[in-house]
A protein has these predicted regions:
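Surface-exposed interaction regions that form or flank ligand-binding interfaces
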Residues: 1-60, 67-72, 81-83, 92, ...
């Protein structure tokens, strides 16, 4: 009887985790990592799940940083299902699942902060024009509005990256960029994840007070 009870508890814990934002985020990140491994070869390097101090008192969390001869691509993944509505200038986009709608931050605005942090970190190595923002939703979502040119579903983003065909970063500079970013990354742990979440909550609270 006790064994059966423990088994049920384990199943419930696993099912809860599978539905959690953390698991969904990890699956979205894994999707991008697989695409890079299969399609872009050895000339590019990928940094995943990077928590980096910003220029204030908080942190910013970047899903992927792809360092290639053709530029540095900052990738924000969204493991969302359902219909997606949004445009470049809207502060919030909408996810619709059946009759329910959910608002979420415009990922382009979210990734803009990531871009600015990396721009500062790499200011003496790389010109800002070689930093590129990419937003990747999973294939389980469906866009219901026309999306900006750097927002994709599934592996379609690979073709966008490949459209940059002029080599602008030498192999030596790629290594410098990789090393510089790695120096800034906070060691991944539950503590850094918690600190980032608390910072986002505090920021959201402050914004509400300002409004």
């Amino acid at each position: 009887m006790l064994f059966y009870f423990i088994f049920i508890i384990i199943i419930l814990v696993v099912l809860t985790y599978l539905k959690s934002p953390h698991f969904k985020g990890k699956m979205g990140e894994l999707m991008v990592a697989v695409h890079v491994d299969k399609a872009l070869g050895d000339e590019s390097s990928l940094l995943n799940n990077c928590t980096i101090p910003d220029q204030g008192q908080g942190t910013t969390q970047i899903d992927h940083i792809l360092i290639s001869p053709y530029g540095v691509f900052i990738i924000e993944t969204k493991n969302y299902t359902g219909w997606i509505f949004g445009s470049a200038r809207q502060k919030q986009w909408t996810q619709k699942i059946y009759k329910k709608s959910y608002k979420f931050q415009n990922p382009l605005h979210q990734n803009y902060k990531h871009m600015k942090v990396l721009e500062m970190i790499l200011s003496d190595i790389l010109e800002p024009k070689y930093l590129h923002s990419v937003i990747v939703f999973t294939p389980r979502s469906e866009f219901k509005t026309e999306m900006p040119e750097n927002v994709f579903r599934g592996k379609a983003w690979i073709n966008y990256v490949k459209s940059f065909n002029e080599e602008v970063i030498s192999s030596m500079k790629q290594k410098r960029i990789h090393y510089r970013i790695e120096k800034e990354i906070l060691e991944s742990s539950w503590k850094t994840d918690r600190q980032h979440i608390e910072y986002l909550k505090q920021k959201s609270t402050n914004n509400k007070h300002l409004n």
